């Protein structure tokens, strides 16, 4: 070989192998933008480098971009300068040939000359391999991948070393040839390994094709970090994050790209996609779209293909939003000015169709007929145009012959939209045909999308505008009033809406429509959630505020809140005043205020609103023509009936039926009329009018579902309930009907039959995950747990669905198969320990929370806490990117679950700490505030209880638990009146609220109003006669009987509760029984004299009572020793005549009575010590001890034992004949307990000893009345004092009452009654 040639090749190799960072970056940029169709941007990159450096390969690439832009003369002039370049001539020649061939009138002579020159240069051995490499590069962009590969192979053979550019171009050519093997990836990795940026771009492309979003993000992130100023790296990272649906990360990438707004069109496309699909901020969206348009005008002003592509993207993700479609039209106008390509005209028709512009659709349709265009919108343009002016028969005639001429139409979703409209307006108006066409539309769209990873190309095909057209077509079949279950129409629309929302959660109107769907199936909680999601994206959405007002009224919320929502909606759209819906909701607010006349006036105003002209456009839903008029008529009828204007109501119904006769709305009216009959209790009438709807009529489906509900809920007829669904299945044997019949059998608790129908539906619709979930639930309901587990496992593997995994884990948890449950939950967590996309993070959080529950069940608390901490950490990752109300609530929920675990384990300090974390997420969170209140209450920290409790009541004034805690707070603080009011409020809502009832009995009996306490006890029994068997009621009734002196009845009540599983009521009952055992019928067996001079009988009686009390005390021992238990234990021990035992018990009480600083901490223990001294006849220390309580503030906690202390002091003074001092203490007792029978007894004794029998009789009369005149002992004392005061007839009457209670009470007859009669005879 010639030495000169060899030397040249060595120089070439040096040049090729030299790592020129700036050249590589520039070439990689140009390659990237050219592949992506941003030819103008690529030219700007070329010009930027060529202005400072002579770079022939880059100059040739500029020529390629000029050809792609259609600037042929300029491209030819530019490329001719390099056709003789020694190193790159082949590339320039191929580019020149391409340019000439692309001209409007190709110069054949020039093309022949160029081909000859190419052939000559290619055969020349002196041609350097760089020239072949350049040729391969040009041919790649020309789409001639096979020729490109041949040239690159020659370049490789002539080069002794292969470098990054070679590997990378070979990889791209392989991709162009459809090769996506591992070898292609290795080529890109080799190029990337030499720090050639386009090599890493190739890696990203391969991973994108494999749908490997996480790996793509890692690769793009490496590129973005290693070459910070290489913009395609940031773009690819953003695309990876879009694939992961991490929209917050996308915006971070846009910011990190550090590009001036509007300077780079690709960045602006990403910003616009983020704005429409996620941000949803309408006010910002206008500016975003304007920035994108400006960027294209500045960088790609003659790139009509890019204008058209972006137009299609915007239309596809618009959700048929009018504002977005009008912006899209601005982009397309620029493309059409540059080129009138048929596809662009078809796209223009699609926009006009979306805007409902029938005239423009007609004009464009005529143009498309003359053009050769295979776009479905073009093929069906004339049919579309006809349907937009109601020419149904002409449209059908054309439509029927279309598939024969264009077979591929059957794969187009748009074809099925047209078919659904024609089915809806056919003679039979078959809903089933309509529904099937919509299902086909969804299926075809999914088929088109399934091979594409989620990204720009996916969004280009998504067609949310088309889906929304299909959704609107379903509106005509919607119910007018909320139903109890979704029908097929709403299931269908919910499916499509969810598809749109999953792709573009920024489309607020989609969230609003999902809210409306939930509202119409009476799922108010879900409806509220969707309304907030809609307003989160667009708070100016007037319809969302109106629906919120509707929801507030239907849920019985505050009327003012509903009014506020109405006003807010009106502020955003004043035209709402012209709609029936606005007046309908306004009338409901008047009805809630019982302003029926104003409601009637508002409804009549609504009916006088001028009827909107019905559109001829069959693609426009009738809802836009204000079908709420029917709802107004029904509401008017209902209001007239409520106000007893029956004739007016019937006339209005007749007018409505006449107005809508023969129209589809008539059937809607029939359904609503049936609902109206039902609210009036006319079940048969409701069934009769529903039965009139026959197969083929639009509301047949809904009528049978409604009939089934009536048979089940009103008539309790399961047979007819199933028959309605069987009739549906007979008429419409579709997967939906089989599924509905399965639902019906699930509703009547017959899961085995349900499984058969679900399985049949799944055979017909094998990809339906929801059906699979229903089968699993049916297996569980049928207690076929092994089958359920196997089914969930197989379904989890088939559908790759997170819900299946969660359901399986939940079931395993219920079955106590903790090991397998943990394994199922661990698998996805271990597979991706640090997820980055929002959806995966949210799924992981659900897995972790369930795993924490699993760990708690096996007592692995440290692991459970780790699960909670990991869940919180993952949640914080999402919240760092966005800070929505929903996310804050979710963060609070996670904290609450952890706090509740601490609370269950009585670990209060960490529970308080986690509750405070929850409040940092969401400061008005109810659960955390309630839990804090509960913890402070359990810790007896009442000063801290009030703040979290009031925080709850500010948000939810009717919260029962908060009101109860507040009532207890007042009770503990001895604010009896406030406490009473709060408890009564709770009882008015729920007469069976035992805690509140117990407190009310206590408070009323202390006030001396025991008859009122009895009324509440009777109210509970009236509300539920079976409540007498409940422990709560038994303890409340026992307490009442104890206060009224009937200890035998009290004991019977308490005995019913002593074995209750409810620990609270069981303990109360047992302590009360022990107290009665030690002091039966308030008769003192033990006193100082009986201990001093113990008789055998007294000792035996005391021992028997002590033994009985001990039995019940032992039952309490199972709960565990508490302070109250130790007190009861010592009182039982003290109930003896043995002085040593009494002294030992005093020592025990001493240990409990005082704190380290000798301050009193237990009034009960002080009473125990004093009673012990009193029994041992040590009156002086007893008195000194009791006097130490002087000045102690009375409170409900100490009330019982404070009263006992005062009574004991009074008894000591009565024994010492110190009447005045005794009276002081007895008055103190009666001040806080007007029904204290022991106080009455001691007071009576004192007055008798003073021989003040009149006063004594008054006291005994109070005591006798307090016991409902059932106490023989008080009856005897009253009769005795009446005898002494010579009130003889009243005395005899009292004696008779006692004998009526207990005929075996001869003492009263012999000692009092006979004497009184004798005294009457002698006077």
Swiss-Prot record:
Q: Which GO terms describe its biological process?
A: intraciliary retrograde transport; protein localization to cilium
Q: What keywords are annotated for this sequence in UniProt?
A: Repeat, TPR repeat
Q: Does the keyword Repeat apply?
A: yes
The signal peptide here is none
Q: What is this protein called?
A: Tetratricopeptide repeat protein 21 homolog
UniProt xrefs under SMART domains: TPR (SM00028)
Q: What family is this protein classified in?
A: Belongs to the TTC21 family.
Q: Does the keyword Repeat apply?
A: yes
> Pfam families recorded for this chain?
ARM_TT21, ARM_TT21_2nd, ARM_TT21_4th, ARM_TT21_5th, ARM_TT21_C, ARM_TT21_N, TPR_7
Organism domain of life: Eukaryota
GO CC annotation? cilium; intraciliary transport particle A
Q: Which PROSITE patterns match?
A: TPR, TPR_REGION
Q: Where are the TPR repeats?
A: 56-89, 411-444, 580-613, 667-700, 702-735, 736-768, 770-802, 804-835, 845-878, 892-925, 927-959, 961-993, 995-1027, 1031-1064, 1203-1236, 1238-1270, 1272-1305
Q: Extract the InterPro entries matched here.
A: ARM_TT21_2nd (IPR056832), ARM_TT21_4th (IPR056836), ARM_TT21_5th (IPR056835), ARM_TT21_C (IPR056834), ARM_TT21_N (IPR056833), TPR-like_helical_dom_sf (IPR011990), TPR_rpt (IPR019734), TTC21A/TTC21B (IPR040364)
């Amino acid at each position: 070989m010639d030495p000169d040639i060899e030397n040249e090749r060595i120089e070439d190799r040096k040049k090729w192998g030299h790592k020129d960072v700036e050249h590589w970056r520039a070439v990689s940029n140009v390659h990237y933008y050219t592949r992506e169709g941003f030819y103008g941007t690529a030219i700007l990159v070329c010009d930027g480098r060529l202005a400072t450096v002579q770079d022939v390969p880059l100059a040739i690439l500029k020529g390629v971009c000029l050809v792609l832009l259609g600037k042929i003369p300029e491209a030819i002039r530019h490329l001719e300068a390099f056709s003789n370049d020694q190193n790159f001539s082949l590339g320039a020649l191929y580019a020149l040939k391409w340019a000439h061939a692309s001209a409007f009138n190709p110069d054949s002579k020039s093309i022949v000359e160029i081909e000859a020159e190419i052939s000559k240069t290619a055969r020349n051995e002196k041609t350097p391999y760089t020239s072949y490499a350049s040729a391969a590069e040009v041919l790649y962009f020309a789409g001639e991948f096979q020729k490109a590969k041949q040239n690159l192979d020659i370049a490789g053979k002539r080069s002794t070393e292969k470098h990054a550019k070679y590997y990378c171009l070979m990889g791209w050519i392989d991709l162009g040839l459809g090769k996506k093997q591992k070898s292609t990836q290795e080529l890109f990795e080799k190029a990337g390994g030499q720090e050639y940026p386009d090599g890493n771009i190739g890696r990203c492309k391969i991973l994108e094709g494999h749908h490997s979003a996480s790996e793509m993000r890692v690769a793009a992130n490496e590129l973005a970090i290693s070459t910070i100023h290489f913009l395609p790296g940031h773009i690819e990272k953003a695309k990876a994050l879009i694939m992961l649906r991490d929209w917050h990360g996308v915006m971070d990438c846009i910011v990190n790209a550090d590009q001036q707004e509007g300077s780079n069109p690709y960045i602006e496309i990403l910003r616009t996609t983020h704005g429409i699909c996620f941000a949803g901020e309408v006010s910002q969206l206008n500016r975003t779209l304007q920035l994108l348009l400006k960027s294209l005008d500045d960088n790609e002003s003659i790139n009509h293909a890019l204008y058209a592509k972006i137009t299609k993207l915007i239309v596809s993700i618009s959700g048929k939003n009018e504002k977005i479609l009008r912006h899209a039209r601005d982009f397309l106008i620029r493309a059409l000015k540059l080129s009138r390509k048929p596809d662009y005209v078809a796209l223009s028709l699609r926009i006009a169709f979306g805007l409902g512009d029938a005239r423009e659709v007609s004009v464009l349709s005529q143009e498309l007929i003359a053009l050769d265009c295979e776009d479905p919108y073009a093929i069906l343009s004339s049919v579309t145009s006809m349907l937009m002016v109601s020419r149904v028969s002409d449209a059908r005639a054309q439509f029927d012959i279309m598939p024969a001429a264009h077979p591929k139409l059957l794969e187009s979703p748009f074809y099925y939209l047209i078919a659904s409209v024609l089915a809806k307006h056919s003679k039979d108006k078959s809903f089933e045909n309509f529904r099937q066409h919509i299902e086909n539309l969804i299926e075809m769209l999914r088929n088109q999308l399934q091979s594409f990873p989620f990204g720009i190309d996916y969004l280009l095909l998504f067609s949310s505008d088309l889906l929304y057209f299909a959704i609107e077509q379903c509106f005509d079949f919607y119910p007018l009033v909320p139903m109890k279950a979704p029908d097929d129409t709403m299931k269908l629309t919910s499916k499509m809406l969810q598809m749109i929302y999953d792709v573009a959660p920024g489309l607020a109107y989609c969230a609003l429509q999902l809210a409306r769907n939930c509202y119409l199936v009476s799922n108010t909680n879900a409806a509220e959630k969707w309304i907030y999601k809609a307003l989160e994206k667009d708070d100016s959405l007037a319809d969302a505020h109106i629906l919120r007002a509707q929801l507030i009224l239907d849920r019985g919320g505050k009327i003012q809140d509903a009014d506020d929502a109405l006003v807010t909606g009106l502020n955003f759209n004043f035209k709402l005043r012209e709609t029936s819906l606005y007046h309908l909701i306004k009338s409901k607010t008047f009805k809630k205020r019982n302003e029926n006349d104003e409601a009637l006036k508002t409804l009549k105003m609504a009916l006088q609103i001028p009827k909107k002209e019905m559109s001829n456009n069959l693609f426009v839903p009738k809802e836009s023509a204000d079908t709420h008029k029917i709802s107004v008529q029904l509401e008017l009828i209902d209001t007239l009936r409520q106000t007893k204007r029956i004739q007016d109501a019937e006339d209005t119904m007749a007018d409505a039926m006449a107005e809508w006769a023969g129209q589809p709305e008539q059937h809607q009216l029939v359904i609503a009329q049936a609902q109206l009959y039902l609210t009036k209790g006319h079940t048969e009438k409701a069934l009769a009018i529903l039965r009139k709807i026959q197969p083929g009529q639009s509301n047949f489906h809904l009528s049978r579902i409604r009939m089934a509900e009536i048979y089940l809920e009103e008539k309790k007829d399961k047979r007819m309930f199933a028959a309605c669904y069987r009739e549906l299945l007979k008429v419409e044997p579709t997967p939906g009907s089989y599924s509905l019949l399965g639902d019906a059998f699930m509703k009547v608790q017959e899961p085995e039959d349900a499984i058969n129908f679900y399985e049949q539906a799944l055979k017909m619709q094998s990809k339906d995950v929801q059906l699979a979930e229903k089968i699993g639930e049916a297996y569980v309901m049928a207690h076929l747990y092994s089958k359920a587990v196997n089914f969930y496992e197989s379904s989890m593997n088939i559908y790759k669905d997170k819900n299946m995994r969660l359901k399986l884990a939940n079931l395993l948890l219920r079955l106590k198969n903790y090991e397998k449950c943990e394994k199922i939950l661990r698998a996805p967590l271990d597979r991706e320990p640090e997820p980055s996309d929002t959806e995966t993070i949210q799924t992981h959080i659900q897995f972790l929370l369930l795993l924490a529950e699993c760990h708690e069940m096996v007592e692995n608390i440290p692991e459970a806490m780790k699960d909670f901490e990991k869940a919180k950490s993952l949640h914080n990752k999402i919240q760092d990117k966005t800070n929505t109300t929903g996310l804050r609530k979710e963060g609070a929920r996670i904290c609450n679950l952890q706090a509740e675990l601490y609370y269950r384990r009585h670990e209060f300090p960490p529970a308080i700490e986690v509750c405070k974390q929850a409040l940092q997420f969401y400061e008005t969170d109810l659960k955390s505030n309630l839990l804090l209140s509960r913890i402070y209450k359990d810790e007896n920290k009442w000063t801290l209880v009030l703040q979290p409790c009031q925080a709850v009541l500010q948000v939810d004034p009717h919260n029962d638990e908060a009101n109860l805690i507040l009532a207890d707070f007042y009770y503990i603080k001895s604010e009896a009146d406030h406490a009473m009011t709060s408890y009564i409020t709770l009882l008015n809502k729920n007469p069976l609220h035992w805690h509140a009832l117990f407190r009310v009995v206590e408070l009323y009996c202390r006030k001396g109003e025991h008859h009122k306490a009895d009324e509440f006890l009777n109210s509970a029994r009236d509300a539920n006669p079976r409540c007498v068997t409940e422990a709560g009621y038994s303890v409340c009734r026992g307490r009442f009987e104890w206060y009224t002196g009937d200890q035998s009845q009290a004991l019977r009540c308490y005995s019913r509760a002593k074995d209750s599983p409810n620990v609270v009521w069981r303990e109360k009952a047992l302590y009360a029984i022990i107290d009665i055992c030690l002091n039966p019928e308030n008769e003192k067996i033990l006193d100082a004299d009986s201990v001093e001079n113990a008789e055998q009988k007294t000792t035996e009686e005391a021992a028997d009572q002590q033994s009985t009390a001990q039995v019940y005390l032992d039952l309490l021992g199972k709960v565990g020793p508490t302070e109250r238990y130790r007190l009861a234990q010592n009182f039982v021990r003290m109930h003896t005549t043995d002085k040593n035992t009494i002294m030992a018990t005093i020592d025990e009480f001493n240990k409990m009575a005082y704190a380290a600083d000798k301050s009193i901490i237990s009034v009960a223990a002080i009473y125990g010590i004093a009673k012990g001294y009193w029994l041992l006849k040590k009156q002086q220390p007893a008195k000194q001890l009791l006097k130490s309580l002087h000045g102690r503030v009375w409170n409900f906690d100490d009330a019982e034992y404070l009263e006992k202390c005062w009574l004991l002091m009074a008894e000591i003074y009565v024994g010492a004949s110190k009447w005045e001092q005794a009276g002081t203490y007895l008055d103190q007792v009666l001040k806080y307990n007007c029904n204290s029978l022991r106080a009455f007894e001691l007071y009576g004794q004192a007055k008798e000893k003073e021989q003040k029998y009149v006063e004594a009789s008054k006291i005994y009369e109070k005591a006798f009345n307090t016991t409902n005149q059932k106490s023989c002992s008080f009856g005897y004392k009253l009769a005795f004092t009446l005898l002494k005061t010579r009130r003889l007839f009243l005395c005899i009457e009292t004696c008779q009452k006692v004998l009526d209670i207990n005929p075996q009470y001869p003492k009263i007859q012999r000692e009092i009654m006979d004497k009184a009669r004798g005294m009457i005879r002698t006077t």
